Amino acid sequence: MALLAIHSWRWAAAAVAFEKHKHSAVLTRSLVSICGSGLRWSSYQSGASGSARLSQTTESLRNSTQQRWEKNNSRQLLDASKVLQAWPLIEKRTCWHGHAGGGLHTDPKEGLKDVDTRKIIKAMLSYVWPKDRPDLRARVAISLGFLGGAKAMNIVVPFMFKYAVDSLNQMSGNMLNLSDAPNTVATMATAVLIGYGVSRAGAAFFNEVRNAVFGKVAQNSIRRIAKNVFLHLHNLDLGFHLSRQTGALSKAIDRGTRGISFVLSALVFNLLPIVFEMTLVSSVLYYKCGAQFALVTLGTLGAYTAFTVAVTRWRTRFRIEMNKADNDAGNAAIDSLLNYETVKYFNNEKYEAQRYDGFLKTYETASLKSTSTLAMLNFGQSAIFSVGLTAIMVLASQGIVAGALTVGDLVMVNGLLFQLSLPLNFLGTVYRETRQALIDMNTLFTLLKVDTRIKDKAMASPLQITPQTATVAFDNVHFEYIEGQKVLSGVSFEVPAGKKVAIVGGSGSGKSTIVRLLFRFYEPQKGSIYLAGQNIQDVSLESLRRAVGVVPQDAVLFHNTIYYNLLYGNINASPEEVYAVAKLAGLHDAILRMPHGYDTQVGERGLKLSGGEKQRVAIARAILKDPPVILYDEATSSLDSITEETILGAMRDVVKHRTSIFIAHRLSTVVDADEIIVLSQGKVAERGTHYGLLANSSSIYSEMWHTQSTRIQNHDNLGWDAKKESLSKEEERKKLQEEIVNSVKGCGNCSC
């Protein structure tokens, strides 16, 4: 009995240690779960008016930030940022999907309302019992069989104790009289004790085999769910990703998959078996010892369960607060580390650390509440069980005194109850963790329910296109990111197959929006877009995006080798094809000069490469994709003139015999375009060739051209003035040197 009590105490201590370890591990993951930056394209065109409104709110942001530090409350940073113009605009976006739920963005007090336990478990069990995997179903059935065997062996163990004690004390009328013990030990007791050992070994064997058999089912289910969520996130539209923080999504998926692993084991091998074992024990006590024993046992178990459920539901709110603080801390860490250079530029290391520490402080507060209430829960559980055990032992003692029960019955009752204490202690832990895991899983399965606004029509046909038919046409296209703020208003134009067309205009005129609409990142509110004479909404997304290549303004590369990033344009390409496109983009020789050649790591987002090298990689992988249509979204706007001219040369070679659209800010890069389309206030204001547009001195294009030319000329004049000043100083220095030399001519002695 003492040994069983010690084991029970160790189990409770282990449960407490497990939860504390889990809490501390969450903080560590905030720093190490750094993932890709995801999509970074701007979600809307703010224009000059947006910039003006932004500058007007700078002072209010500064005041809000100062108050936040005075109150030492990290949450006020988010409140202060809401005064920025971008925040209300984002909240009004037509592509806004709302919050994911399950603690990702939820209010801690409302988080539990989003958890539909029945639907979550039903969705999870569809992965455990898949219709297309009879092998996994067989494993589940075998595991349940081993589970039943293990529980049966557990119930047999106390009976072995009972029979052993009764055999050793078979002299009726003399309680604990062991005068003939040597004879009984040699016969019945020895056999019973051997049976006791076999029963315990059998129970352990069944449990371990069950775990081994079910392991493949659990891991396969987790892998399939994680893969489906990952693929689903990639299938969601750009608007969803622009309204989500990558760090929060990553943590939600991580916690959700870990929650699935726990719930699978708890539900199949803990909760249901515990209920089965409690029912079996109560029935045994009823038939062997009487109704009083069964009633006390059921009362104890009922009080224990009710107390555990009530307190755990109360404690769950602290877990939701911990999740939210964990998300905020993770986002702060990821954003700060991804913007390492920006932090250094402004010497804001301490600011970032204090901001991060504010979120950790919130997490710490919620974690302390969770830990303290856990201690209260454990004490209450122990008190309830101790009262029930005491009552059962008193009843058993009275039965022995009355002659209705034997000493073996006392040992059996004690063993059955202590055997229940292990699953009961585990029941508390299982319920707490299951409840919390369901909250984590809710976010995961909620993500699976988010429907993308951009998807194929039913029975969408693949795009039929060749380089000879790759005509692009916009027909009266209207589009707005934010309701009531037009970005494109009735835009119509056509790009003939094999021609180069440039689209220019001021900031916020809708140039880059055309690229996103053609690639179907968004859908126009009105009008149609045609590629090769086919409405892009009627063809499959996969075939459409395979036919269009994009060289973005900011080429974000994977944290991998140069070869991997080049191969990404066509993962089935041969090494020779990769080398060929690198040569065409003028990148091959530069790669060979690197220490590791094509195996050189490019760093996070490709930051180890120069801007020109990143753009060449983007061009090369677009070539490797070999699409009939290529889009250049201001691909050289951030480069110097020499690098820009070199890359433009590579572009000219690429676009030969292809349909190409150049989104340009520098007009000098598109003077050779077959047609130039000028956008102004979301409309096609002008169109024509470079020289044709310049012929009209009052045209928008002509004004833009002369403005840029004047800026370049002034820059050149400043350079020439600096050069002349340098030359005049050099001439003055030479003249002075000649005077010094002439002054020492004479006898040849410097002292003359």
Curated annotation (Swiss-Prot):
One of its GO terms (molecular function) is identical protein binding. Residues 23-140, 207-259, 312-382, 431-752 are mitochondrial matrix. It is a multi-pass membrane protein. Keywords: Acetylation, ATP-binding, Membrane, Mitochondrion, Mitochondrion inner membrane, Nucleotide-binding, Phosphoprotein, Transit peptide, Transmembrane, Transmembrane helix, Transport. It catalyses: (glutathione)4[2Fe(III)-2S] cluster(in) + ATP + H2O = (glutathione)4[2Fe(III)-2S] cluster(out) + ADP + phosphate + H(+). Residues 140-436 form the ABC transmembrane type-1 domain. The keyword Acetylation applies. GO terms for biological process: intracellular iron ion homeostasis; iron ion transmembrane transport; iron-sulfur cluster assembly; iron-sulfur cluster export from the mitochondrion; negative regulation of reactive oxygen species biosynthetic process; positive regulation of heme biosynthetic process; positive regulation of iron-sulfur cluster assembly; transmembrane transport. One of its GO terms (cellular component) is mitochondrial inner membrane. The modification Phosphoserine is found at residue 336. PROSITE patterns: ABC_TM1F, ABC_TRANSPORTER_1, ABC_TRANSPORTER_2. Residues 1-22 form a transit peptide. Exports glutathione-coordinated iron-sulfur clusters such as [2Fe-2S]-(GS)4 cluster from the mitochondria to the cytosol in an ATP-dependent manner allowing the assembly of the cytosolic iron-sulfur (Fe/S) cluster-containing proteins and participates in iron homeostasis. Moreover, through a functional complex formed of ABCB7, FECH and ABCB10, also plays a role in the cellular iron homeostasis, mitochondrial function and heme biosynthesis. In cardiomyocytes, regulates cellular iron homeostasis and cellular reactive oxygen species (ROS) levels through its interaction with COX4I1. Belongs to the ABC transporter superfamily. ABCB family. Heavy Metal importer (TC 3.A.1.210) subfamily. This is Iron-sulfur clusters transporter ABCB7, mitochondrial. It comes from Rattus norvegicus.
